[in-house]
Amino acid sequence: MTPWTRRRFLGEASCSALSGVAVLNTLLNLKLAERASAQGAPNDYKTLVCLFLNGGNDSFNWLVPRDAGRHAVYATARGNLALGVGDLLALNQTPEGDGQLYGIHPSCAGLQELFNGLGGDAGKRRAAFVANVGTLIQPTTKAQYLAESVPLPRALFSHSDQIDQWQTSVPQGMSELTGWGGRAADVLHASANTGQTAMGISLAGNNLFQVGSTVRQFVITADGALTLAGANTDAASDPLNPLRLKNAAQKSLLEQHYAGLMAESFAQLTKTSLDAQEFFLSQFNSYDDSAVAGLFPGGNFLARQFRAAAKAIALRPQLGLKRQTLFLSYGGWDHHSE
């Protein structure tokens, strides 16, 4: 497929007077709004689970060519990090692969089963690779980079900026303050969801991916919703719990009206967050998670995140969610110290 030039994209979109960032956001939001308007309130449920690999996954040793010619090119480029053909887990050929042979890292047996349709998902291909994708504005050679003859992302090679670019889908600049998951929630949340829980739930702290112009992300942990220090949701129903008066005092302060706009906004935001936290935690703690406990065995950080995500998905009727994004993260994916 012939790559689109920036000029061609702007011209064919009839938006040549707009910047690249404005065009991107406008087109994506218009498309989402068009579909949401046409479909009305959805009757089905869909969620997007984003596992963000902090540090940069070494994808050159994840998906590797197995045919002799291309493997030789790969081995030359990787040096002593290269994997032998015999070490790779073979992937079945696909119509999209043009007959080329690939394998994956020997530690990824589960991914091989998902791709090839083996194991518990026999006959169902549940994994795909989207290759040659990055934060460049357009395909760029080393010579073009050195000559600065093509548009380049700002702060190229800066890990923190590239994280922002992945999560905003805007490589052209660092001024975009919303993520593409958040922009989707701006359009979809009000029409698809009825509960007080946010469409975007994060198990990895605050992130740019779920930040929207009008919506907020809801941050939880593997054990449920975050609470204020010393707060206890069980105290409200227990007259003998010493935290009951403390909780009541906190809510009373938040329900006051303040003259200052900042103080009033902070109080309202905090109260809304606490109400959402209490509701979510009551549902989360009362859910029988035996059905999801075996899906992600182990006590490691990633398994605990996935179990909590599975519980959040299972609670969708109680939370009033038909469209949802879940954000998880896992780090340590680089060779800087090796």
Language model feature labels by segment:
Residues 1-338:
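Feature for exported/extracytoplasmic and membrane-associated proteins, marking the mature portion
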